[in-house]
Amino acid sequence: MLTGVTRQKILITGASSGLGAGMARSFAAQGRDLALCARRTDRLTELKAELSQRYPDIKIAVAELDVNDHERVPKVFAELSDEIGGIDRVIVNAGIGKGARLGSGKLWANKATIETNLVAALVQIETALDMFNQRGSGHLVLISSVLGVKGVPGVKAAYAASKAGVRSLGESLRAEYAQRPIRVTVLEPGYIESEMTAKSASTMLMVDNATGVKALVAAIEREPGRAAVPWWPWAPLVRLMWVLPPRLTRRFA
């Protein structure tokens, strides 16, 4: 859905590398003001310097943020908003890909994934909605995954569950805000080259970072309720995953 609305001031979590940094570069090239946060401030500082040199007319604010520090999330969002003069789009992108087979005795890895990808996402969602409700409008973008469509066996079980939770929260919000000027988009990326996917054993239908980021940004700008990206081949595959019995989902993991 094309809304005709330009979201000028964009906040991205997990912006120090991978898809987050890629989206920041793409939006900067379009002249958007950016509020970028992540744990690795050295990379954020380098990214800000790079973008400020290329696009001197845009505003860029950066801040350290561990999204698992729940009390800091609203503080950092508010500080970044003040620096660039408001926020009208929040991209909940921060996440990790740790995981172990369920029952392997490595609870810590699966717990960390659920906490970072789902619980911390909920904190970011609540914070963004509070900001948007105060300003009267906004666009909330939730980065889920094609693995959030169906449970998968193996080391990505907790990751898939965390992204399914994000997708479900997004669906609830789309219904909740259907008649209000706050739009909610759930994106389900397939395998896109990044630091996270570099550690993955699966490279199924992997696309390079530039191609993946281009697809993500194009989808974000359309502001759909939900989209698999890149559309081909993942939109048809997502439909297939819905109906596959669990024992046949291993290839997607």
UniProtKB/Swiss-Prot annotation:
GO molecular function, one term: oxidoreductase activity
Keyword field contains Oxidoreductase: yes
Source domain of life: Bacteria
Disulfide bond positions: none
Pfam families named among the record's database cross-references: adh_short
PROSITE patterns: ADH_SHORT
EC id: 1.-.-.-
Any one of the GO CC terms: membrane
Keyword terms, alphabetized: Oxidoreductase
Catalytic EC class: oxidoreductase
NCBIfam families: PRK08251.1
Family designation: Belongs to the short-chain dehydrogenases/reductases (SDR) family.
The name this protein goes by in its record: Uncharacterized oxidoreductase MT0971
Organism from which the protein derives: Mycobacterium tuberculosis (strain CDC 1551 / Oshkosh)
